[in-house]
């Protein structure tokens, strides 16, 4: 691939050199006039206008954000909703993003905005000035020797060289000539006065990106990004001005997250400016996220993953353009669910696409993932949200962002498939899901890191060979038309697995119920065994008692038989003895009767004697009473 790029580059340089030698004299004579006329013919160039609308939330001091207080007025143009949505499908059928990520309905209402040629902003970048100057010439032959254009190209080369960006493959005039927006297209010959509303084709942009080693030059990113994501809709700028003055309940949490997370880790390079990038301020990040969270309230966004993308756009463009570019980038790229707090659909779709591609390219890897029950790549979401900036340098992460702007979710699929194919042996030998999680949480890009140059690299890791990674990813034979079938198959398998899991849960519940019943029965059996033991002991005791009672009964029966025999043998003797005893008793009774008669006589005599004694007693009592009275009278007489 690099050989073909070098060959095309050398041929382009030779052709440009020949044109320069032929038209040098002619263009030098007209150079000054052309450079003056270029500023007058830039009606439809990318101009910058202020967007504070006297809004306190949009006003910034120059110390805070000197480079970000402008907005591209050329983006304030209406765009038919269906044409820009079908743009990728018409121009690049082989790299078409996934369907189902069309812009939200708020995109549909447009209003035309006319920008007069007198409102030319002096804050244009060198690339925008180069585009304006090139448009004033109209063709390559007349523009190639313009002193103004040459000075701008020289400045662009210097800017790129200061950032260690190779400029040998960059043809600035081709980048300036490529149509990026609808107004860059030539007028229709049949109706010259009609303005073009259809978006320009993407094929020239893609060819230039391929020639530049699949990378957009840093000075061109501002315009090319907006062109790739179709962010030329002026109603988003108006909406941004409205949302910036609207109260947001998430402002406190957004400020807290920005204060805690900004300019740390992958965000640290955005703290400083460069020759092609602006310095990003925390206030500009807050304004963009404030408007973005108000723009889409259908889901709850996670603020931390949005920080890197927001800083990337703010480092190249103003707040309004960064807002609409962020909206279009997330909506059209199909990566919206990377930034949602509770994400499930992308978790399934991303893994479904990766697993489907692995099933076509390396069935052993797909079978291994299925064997260890892998169903999610959510561990990689923070790295995917920042274009692997946590493992790459900022220029390399921005290169990946260029490819994501072109391919969308498909590029993430290609990058992950390339990594998994590179680590095929490691994945095939995995035996548990814990090993897979450990692999994702470790250095996933280890297979693409360059060999060690120093003996010890304790504090830093070796750089990643991004060219090899991107070339391997784009060289994969992936058919994007199979993506819907991958998703449907995965949805079917997930539904089957869900059904099986539900059945398994029901069986587990039934098993638990049966286990509890068995436990209860076992406890009942233990109790019954105890009762059975008690009853068996009682039965044995009863049997012993019964045997003893039977023995006693036999003895009693024998005694009774003996008694009966004895009674049968001695009845007469008993009768005689009874008669004798009766006669004796009769005699004794007669004696008692005689004794009773004598006793009665004695009792009568005693009764008579008792009567006499009682009579004497009464007489004595009377005598005693008389004596007492006499005694009292005598005693009283002696007292007196």
From Swiss-Prot:
Domain Rab-GAP TBC, chain residue ranges per copy: 215-408
GO cellular component, one term: Golgi-associated vesicle
The keyword Cytoplasm is annotated on this UniProt entry: yes
Coiled-coil zones: 500-636
Subcellular location, record wording: Nucleus; Cytoplasm
Region listing for Disordered, in residue ranges: 96-120
Low complexity bias: start-end ranges: 109-120
Annotated keywords: Coiled coil, Cytoplasm, GTPase activation, Nucleus
SMART domains: TBC
InterPro entries per UniProt: Rab-GAP-TBC_dom, Rab-GAP_TBC_sf, Rab_GAP_TBC_domain
GO biological process: endoplasmic reticulum to Golgi vesicle-mediated transport; signaling
Highest taxon, organism lineage: Eukaryota
GO molecular function per UniProt: GTPase activator activity
Protein family: Belongs to the GYP5 family.
The protein's name: Putative GTPase-activating protein C1620.12c
Species of origin: Schizosaccharomyces pombe (strain 972 / ATCC 24843) (Fission yeast)
């Amino acid at each position: 691939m690099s050989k073909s790029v070098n060959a095309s580059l050398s041929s382009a340089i030779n052709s440009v050199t020949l044109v320069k030698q032929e038209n040098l004299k002619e263009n030098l004579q007209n150079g000054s006039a052309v450079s003056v006329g270029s500023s007058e013919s830039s009606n439809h160039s990318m101009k910058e206008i202020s967007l504070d609308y006297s809004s306190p939330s949009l006003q910034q001091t120059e110390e805070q954000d000197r480079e970000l207080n402008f907005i591209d007025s050329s983006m304030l143009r209406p765009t038919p909703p269906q044409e820009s949505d079908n743009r990728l499908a018409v121009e690049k059928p082989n790299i078409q993003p996934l369907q189902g990520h069309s812009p939200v309905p708020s995109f549909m209402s447009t209003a035309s905005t006319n920008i007069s040629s007198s409102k030319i902003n002096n804050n244009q970048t060198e690339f925008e000035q180069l585009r304006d100057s090139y448009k004033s010439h109209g063709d390559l032959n007349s523009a190639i020797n313009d002193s103004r254009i040459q000075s701008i190209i020289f400045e662009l080369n210097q800017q790129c060289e200061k950032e260690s960006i190779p400029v040998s493959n960059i043809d600035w005039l081709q980048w300036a000539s490529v149509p990026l927006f609808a107004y860059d297209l030539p007028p229709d010959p049949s109706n010259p006065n009609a303005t073009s509303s259809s978006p320009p084709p993407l094929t020239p942009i893609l060819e230039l990106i391929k020639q530049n080693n699949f990378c957009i030059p840093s000075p061109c990113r501002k315009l090319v990004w907006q062109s790739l994501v179709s962010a030329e809709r002026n109603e988003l700028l108006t909406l941004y001005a409205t949302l910036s003055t609207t109260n947001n309940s998430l402002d406190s949490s957004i400020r807290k997250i920005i204060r805690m997370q900004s300019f740390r880790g992958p965000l640290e390079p955005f703290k400083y400016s460069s020759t092609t990038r602006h310095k990003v301020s925390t206030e500009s990040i807050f304004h963009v996220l404030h408007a973005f969270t108000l723009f889409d309230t259908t889901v709850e966004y996670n603020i931390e993953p949005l920080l890197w993308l927001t800083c990337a756009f703010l480092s190249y463009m103003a707040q309004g353009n960064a807002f609409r570019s962020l909206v279009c980038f997330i909506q059209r790229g199909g990566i919206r669910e990377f930034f949602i707090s509770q994400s499930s659909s992308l978790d399934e779709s991303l893994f479904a696409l990766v697993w489907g591609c692995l099933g076509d390219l390396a069935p052993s890897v797909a079978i291994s993932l299925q064997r260890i029950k892998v169903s999610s790549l959510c561990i990689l979401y923070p790295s995917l949200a920042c274009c692997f900036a946590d493992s790459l340098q900022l220029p390399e992460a921005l290169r990946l962002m260029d490819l994501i702007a072109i391919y969308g979710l498909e590029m993430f699929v290609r990058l992950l498939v390339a990594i998994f194919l590179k680590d095929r042996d490691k994945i095939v030998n995995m035996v548990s899901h814990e090993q897979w999680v450990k692999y994702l949480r470790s250095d996933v890009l280890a297979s693409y890191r360059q060999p060690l140059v120093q003996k010890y690299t304790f504090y830093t890791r070796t750089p990643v060979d991004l060219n090899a990674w991107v070339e391997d990813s784009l060289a994969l034979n992936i058919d994007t038309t199979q993506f819907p079938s991958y998703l449907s198959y995965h949805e079917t398998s997930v539904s089957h697995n869900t059904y099986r899991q539900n059945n398994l849960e029901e069986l587990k519940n039934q098993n638990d119920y049966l286990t509890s019943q068995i436990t209860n029965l076992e406890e009942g059996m233990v109790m019954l065994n105890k009762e059975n033991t008690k009853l068996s002991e009682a039965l044995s005791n009863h049997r012993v008692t019964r045997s003893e009672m039977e023995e006693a009964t036999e003895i009693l029966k024998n005694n009774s038989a003996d008694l009966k025999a004895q009674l049968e043998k001695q009845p007469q003797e008993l009768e005689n003895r009874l008669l004798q005893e009766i006669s004796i008793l009769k005699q004794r009774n007669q004696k008692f009767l005689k004794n009773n008669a004598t006793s009665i006589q004695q009792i009568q005599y005693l009764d008579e004697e008792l009567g006499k004694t009682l009579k004497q007693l009464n007489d004595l009592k009377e005598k005693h009473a008389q004596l007492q009275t006499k005694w009292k009278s005598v005693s009283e007489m002696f007292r007196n």
